[in-house]
């Protein structure tokens, strides 16, 4: 559509999270499993691949949503609305999502 209309394809609020359907938000086991997946080191490679796919398909700007966002809600339970931040806390040092962003940027030097 963007090419056909000769306009840029710019992504807003990009990135990923895994969110249970609202009907399952009360299922702590499901919500916890999704939060754990967002913390899994394997997410780094998937995140980098997702960003590379965007660059390959669009080659244009993609604004990632939410630099920092806690994965827990009040009471310390996993957040049923999703785990959106690249960092879970502003002093995080081991975020798999941020590692994926860094992997992508390292491989895309001169292209972004």
Regions found by a protein language model. Name each.
Residues 8-12, 60-65:
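Structural recognition of the beta-strand scaffold that forms the well-ordered cores
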Residues 22-54, 63-112:
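Aromatic-rich peripheral "rim/lid" segments of glycoside hydrolase catalytic domains that contact
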Residues 1-23:
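Glycoside hydrolase catalytic-domain groove-lining segments
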Residues 3-4, 54-56:
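Acidic (Asp/Glu)-rich catalytic clusters
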């Amino acid at each position: 559509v963007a090419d056909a209309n000769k306009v840029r394809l710019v992504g807003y609020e990009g990135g990923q999270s895994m969110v249970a359907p609202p009907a399952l938000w009360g299922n702590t086991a499901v919500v916890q499993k999704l939060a754990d997946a967002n913390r899994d080191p394997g997410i780094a490679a998937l995140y980098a691949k997702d960003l590379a796919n965007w660059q390959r398909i669009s080659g244009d700007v993609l604004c990632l949503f939410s630099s920092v966002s806690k994965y827990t809600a009040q009471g310390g339970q996993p957040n049923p609305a999703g785990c959106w931040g690249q960092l879970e806390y502003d002093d995080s040092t081991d975020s798999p999502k941020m590692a994926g962003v860094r992997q992508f940027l390292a491989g895309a030097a001169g292209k972004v």
